[in-house]
A protein has these predicted regions:
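ATP/NTP phosphate-donor binding region
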Residues: 2-106, 328
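Fold-independent oxyanion-binding glycine-rich loops
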Residues: 33-34, 56-57, 110-112, 133-136, ...
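A short, small-residue-rich loop immediately preceding and capping a beta-strand
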Residues: 99-137
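A glycine/threonine-rich phosphate-anchoring loop and its flanking beta-alpha core
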Residues: 124-218
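Short glycine/serine/threonine-rich phosphate/pyrophosphate-binding segments
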Residues: 36, 60-64, 114-121, 139-143, ...
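Active-site segments that bind and position negatively charged phosphate/pyrophosphate groups
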Residues: 209-321, 329
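C-terminal charged capping/lid subdomain of soluble metabolic enzymes
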Residues: 2-15, 309-394
Length: 394
């Protein structure tokens, strides 16, 4: 079993070639209605004979049951591992130890973002490949070679990197459209940050992606396409999912949330939006009430405010239309609660990714950016209303 941390920067970001460009992606991406029923067939591509299936208790009685049936039909043996809800070191080590004796040649992670990240961690420890079957389009975790681990209380703990991206990602849009609209919208919030952060890394001569190298043209193009798809199809896709209906808009947005954003953030790079979003997890009540993409949305607005970007108003209006938070009140915070805001700023300031911005970032600048975005969001709520947000948040 492998417990040694992996650092891609030690491989790719050597001082002698510090201007190298590196592109990462999953080996295979499969999306469409009903594809989950063919996962046994897809596993034949990697000659899998013995699989560890990670799912929640609910998942094993729902989507994962189709996975198990497909594995049985393909003659693939499997062991079940029940995920308890938090991608923590304790949860990962427990499942890695329990699955060790069965010697799986692949881990299948069937579920949401934290389960997906746990599956990647488990596969790394067991020295086997990982296949991802997301049941939500709420974040861009499925395609990357990265996992975010949290404490048992849900506070961000650390980021783990892996030598390989998933062997395949299987996205069944029949499953996605039967989940809550709020999950798709949160995924849009996560994915919208991709272009704005990648753009910063591309424009900054010392900006880098998540393996410490310069972004490729492909990563930048994919990131930009991601934002274009969201602006054009996001509102209609959310409306379709609200009625559990698949459509071309849904297919496009699911691909943007999952594949385009997944490649874009890892190969294109991060800037302020994600470090700020991850800092919101320092406030316990936010962990319990809000999804990752909803916090990323607020981080994106703050980053655009910091840049004095002409896109700030466009993105704020889009977030209002789709139902994402645009001010601190919609994230159960208040601009006058300086202690909480300072805690978030202090955590974000420790993250080296914020220095991908093309100018020096100070605590005071982060504070001013948060407040600028909050004030614009508040004024836009007064002007355009918050019907979509209230519908999603009851």
């Amino acid at each position: 079993m492998t417990n040694k941390p992996f650092s891609p920067r030690n491989i790719f970001a050597q001082p002698s070639v510090n201007s190298s460009r590196v592109f990462l992606s999953p080996q295979r991406y499969i999306q469409g209605p009903g594809v989950i029923k063919n996962c046994g067939l897809y596993l034949s591509l990697i000659n899998a004979k013995n699989v560890g299936v990670l799912a929640s208790k609910r998942g094993f009685s729902a989507e994962a049951s189709n996975v198990l049936q497909s594995l049985s039909e393909a003659g693939i043996e499997y062991s079940k591992a029940e995920f308890m809800g938090e991608c923590s070191r304790e949860e990962v080590e427990k499942h890695a130890n329990n699955l060790l004796n069965s010697k799986p040649d692949c881990i299948l992670a069937v579920g949401g973002g934290k389960l997906v990240d746990a599956g990647k961690c488990i596969a790394h420890r067991l020295n086997c490949q990982v296949g991802i079957i997301p049941t939500l389009a709420s974040n861009d975790a499925p395609c990357s070679s990265i996992s975010v681990l949290y404490t048992v209380d849900g506070v961000k703990d650390l980021v783990e990197y892996f030598p390989q991206n998933p062997a395949f990602v299987i996205v069944d849009t029949e499953v996605i459209v039967n989940a809550s609209e709020r999950y798709l919208v949160a995924g849009i919030g996560d994915a919208m940050a991709t272009w704005y952060e990648a753009r910063v890394c591309e424009d900054n001569p010392v900006g880098s992606n998540l393996v410490g190298c310069r972004p490729t043209l492909a990563a930048s193009a994919i990131s930009e396409k991601c934002a274009q798809i969201l602006f054009e199809y996001g509102v209609s896709a959310a409306e379709n999912v609200r009625h559990n209906k698949n459509s071309e808009s849904v297919e496009k947005v699911v691909e943007a949330n999952t594949l385009l954003s997944g490649i874009g953030f890892e190969s294109g790079g991060l800037a302020l939006a994600h470090p700020l979003a991850n800092s919101y997890t320092e406030i316990t009540r936010l962990n319990k009430k809000y999804l990752h993409g909803e916090m990323v949305a607020m981080g994106t607005l703050a980053q655009l405010a910091m840049e004095n970007s002409e896109d700030l108003e466009k993105v704020t209006k889009f977030f209002i239309d789709i139902g994402l938070p645009v001010n601190l009140e919609q994230l159960s915070m208040h601009p006058l609660k300086q202690f909480e805001i300072n805690k978030i700023i202090d955590t974000a300031f420790k993250n080296p990714l914020i220095h991908h911005m093309k100018f020096e970032v100070s605590r005071d600048l982060i504070l001013k950016s948060i407040k600028k975005a909050d004030e614009l969001g508040t004024s836009y709520v007064c002007k355009y209303g918050d019907e979509a947000y209230r519908r999603l948040h009851g």
